[in-house]
């Protein structure tokens, strides 16, 4: 029978490290939080990598620094200057407080620390080399005030953890994301990120939140944002939110900090989304940058080792105030008339995937939808084949007789059955099958007359470098030319001459947001995004001929009854059901 035993210190430290240090970005996060807590105003993050992985992380700050005694203590588990006893946990004002970071990092890496206290009169600094949690070197060195910590050979003694790391670009994207979130929460600090000797990101100290946003995400986005403010006796809300026309396919760009701590909160993200009401479609999310100051007695940050999750007292009042503040900000800018749907010229009904698209002008409001991107002429022979090809999933023959709410096509079957066709879901199914077929044949790109240029934040550009082969499978041809700038030279033929970068940007964001998918799952997700983005939207008026051809195209698909997401494309009311509804016979 197995006996209970006390684990040795090395095993304990590695278990603790597994909770705190998941990947290189975890190291960056812990070191940056320590630097911010040390009252730094300038922080340099220097990352080195080879073609396969990140090899070294060095963080340099101009903070308070440490004495030789403090430097040694810093590597002891649960040694901290942030709190003294359990009472301090109820009002934590620093980013770190457990005293686990350096000990956890040193347990699974080789760490070199150089530090000199600020204003203490010390003529020399302290240098420590720690390997596997043990201090193997200690010496005096010349050093500026502040602290530099270099981390190398991460997970050298835990190969099982190392093999689960993602590609170099994916890990870099996570590093950039950590710096972005802390830079947004701490405008009083100047951050600079260098990768292999090249500057990748830089923010200015005390330049204001908008300047930080502009530096990280671009001036165009910063100029389009709407300021939001709100207040309760225990809560202050400040930040910026996007207009409804600037939305995303997932909530990953809702950035929230509470008392200077960047956090992830589904409840707060949902409150932000709630504030938009019907200004956004159900599957769209805003861009938001919120800074919340909450009474520390209402915030429990001692929930998870990474401190990204928190608990809030009076959560319902807080989320309600956030939703109200967002609603008020949008109302104050008269945005109710904005429509977040895609421009009409980006919507396509494809009849022949191989046909070269020709752009057409946007129609007048209320005019029938013009699908000039694709030819909509099918020969009589093609129409007859459409009506006869297929198996048991083939749609019954039906004739469109109109539209309801510019969203549903009303059609009648030969036996009097009434059909309602969701035009977006139907077209999404058509495009999905076309893109899948083109991908499988490895011949599905439509070259753009003018390449679409994408200027991305470092986080997204790193993700895109990894995603280029995956996007190529779908028909996107993407080249990198310059720092964080890419040219989209071709798109899936089913999309036609799309000139909006939103499809590529949303695909990248989705891939970055969910790395848990396997390669086939990620490829499937990309195909779904391409189909959804390219499909005609609800609210687009279709001519009778376009309605008919969309139904014909739907009938040719392998699974015409549902869209790729599983929603129905067609609902039917047969004659007996209609008679019953009107109590006939």
UniProtKB/Swiss-Prot annotation:
Intrachain disulfide bonds: none
Higher taxonomy: Archaea, Methanobacteriati, Methanobacteriota, Stenosarchaea group, Methanomicrobia
Molecular-function GO term, any one: ATP-dependent DNA damage sensor activity
Protein name as it appears in the record: DNA mismatch repair protein MutL
Membership in a protein family: Belongs to the DNA mismatch repair MutL/HexB family.
UniProt record, GO biological process: mismatch repair
UniProt keyword annotation of ATP-binding present: no
UniProt entry tagged with the keyword Ribosomal protein: no
Classification via Pfam families: DNA_mis_repair (PF01119), HATPase_c_3 (PF13589), MutL_C (PF08676)
Protein's job: This protein is involved in the repair of mismatches in DNA. It is required for dam-dependent methyl-directed DNA mismatch repair. May act as a 'molecular matchmaker', a protein that promotes the formation of a stable complex between two or more DNA-binding proteins in an ATP-dependent manner without itself being part of a final effector complex.
Family matches, as SMART domains: DNA_mis_repair (SM01340), MutL_C (SM00853)
Stored InterPro entries: DNA_mismatch_repair_CS, DNA_mismatch_repair_MutL, DNA_mismatch_S5_2-like, HATPase_C_sf, MutL/Mlh/PMS, MutL/Mlh/Pms-like, MutL_C, MutL_C_dimsub
A cellular component annotation (GO) from this entry: mismatch repair complex
Record's keyword terms, sorted: DNA damage, DNA repair
């Amino acid at each position: 029978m197995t006996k209970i035993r006390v684990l040795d210190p090395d095993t304990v430290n590695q278990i603790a490290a597994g909770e705190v240090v998941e990947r290189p970005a975890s190291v960056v996060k812990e070191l940056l939080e320590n630097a911010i807590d040390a009252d730094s105003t300038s922080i340099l993050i220097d990352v080195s990598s080879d073609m396969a992985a990140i090899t070294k992380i060095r963080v340099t700050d101009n903070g308070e620094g440490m004495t030789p005694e403090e430097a040694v203590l810093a590597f002891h588990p649960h040694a901290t200057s942030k709190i003294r006893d359990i009472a301090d946990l109820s009002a934590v004002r620093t980013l770190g407080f457990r005293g686990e970071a350096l000990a956890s990092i040193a347990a699974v890496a080789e760490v070199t620390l150089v530090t000199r206290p600020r204003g203490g009169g010390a003529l020399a600094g302290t240098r420590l080399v720690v390997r596997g949690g043990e201090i193997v070197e200690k010496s005096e060195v010349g050093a500026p005030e502040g602290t530099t910590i270099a981390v190398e050979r991460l997970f050298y003694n835990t190969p099982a953890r190392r093999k689960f790391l993602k590609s170099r670009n994916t890990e870099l994207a996570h590093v950039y994301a950590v710096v972005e979130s802390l830079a947004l929460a701490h405008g009083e600090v100047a951050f600079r990120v260098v990768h292999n000797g090249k500057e990748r990101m830089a923010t200015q100290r005390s330049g204001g939140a908008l300047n930080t946003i502009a530096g990280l995400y671009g001036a165009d986005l910063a100029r389009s944002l709407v300021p939001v403010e709100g207040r309760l006796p225990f809560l202050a809300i400040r930040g910026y939110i996007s207009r409804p026309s600037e939305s995303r396919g997932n909530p990953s760009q809702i950035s929230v900090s509470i008392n200077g701590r960047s956090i992830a909160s589904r409840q707060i993200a949902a409150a932000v989304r709630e504030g938009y009401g019907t200004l956004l479609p159900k599957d769209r999310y805003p861009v938001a940058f919120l800074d919340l100051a909450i009474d520390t007695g209402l915030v429990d940050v001692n929930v998870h080792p990474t401190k990204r999750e928190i608990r809030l007292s009076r959560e319902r009042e807080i989320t309600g105030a956030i939703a109200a503040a967002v609603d008020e900000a949008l109302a104050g800018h008269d945005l109710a008339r904005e429509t977040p749907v895609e421009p009409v010229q980006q919507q396509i009904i494809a009849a022949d995937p191989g046909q070269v698209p020709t752009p057409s002008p946007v129609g007048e409001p209320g005019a029938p939808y013009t699908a000039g991107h694709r030819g909509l002429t099918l020969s009589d022979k093609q129409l007859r084949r459409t009506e006869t090809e297929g198996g048991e999933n083939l749609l019954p023959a039906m004739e469109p007789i109109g539209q309801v709410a510019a969203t549903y096509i009303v059609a009648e079957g030969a036996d009097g059955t009434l059909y309602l066709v969701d035009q977006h879901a139907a077209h999404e199914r058509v495009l999905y099958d076309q893109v899948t077929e083109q991908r499988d044949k490895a011949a599905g790109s439509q070259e753009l007359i003018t390449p679409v240029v994408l200027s991305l934040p470092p986080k997204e550009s790193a993700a895109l470098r990894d995603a280029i082969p995956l996007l190529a499978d779908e028909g996107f041809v993407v080249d990198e030319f310059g720092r964080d700038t890419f040219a989209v030279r071709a798109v899936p033929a089913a999309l036609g001459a799309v000139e909006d970068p939103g499809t590529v940007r949303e695909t990248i964001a989705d891939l970055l947001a969910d790395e848990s998918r396997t390669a086939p799952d990620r490829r499937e997700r990309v195909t779904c995004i391409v189909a959804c983005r390219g499909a005609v939207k609800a609210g687009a008026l279709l001519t009778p001929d376009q309605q008919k051809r969309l139904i014909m195209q739907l009938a040719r698909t392998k699974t015409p009854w549902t869209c790729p997401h599983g929603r129905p494309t067609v609902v039917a009311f047969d004659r007996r059901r209609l008679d019953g509804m009107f109590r006939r016979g």
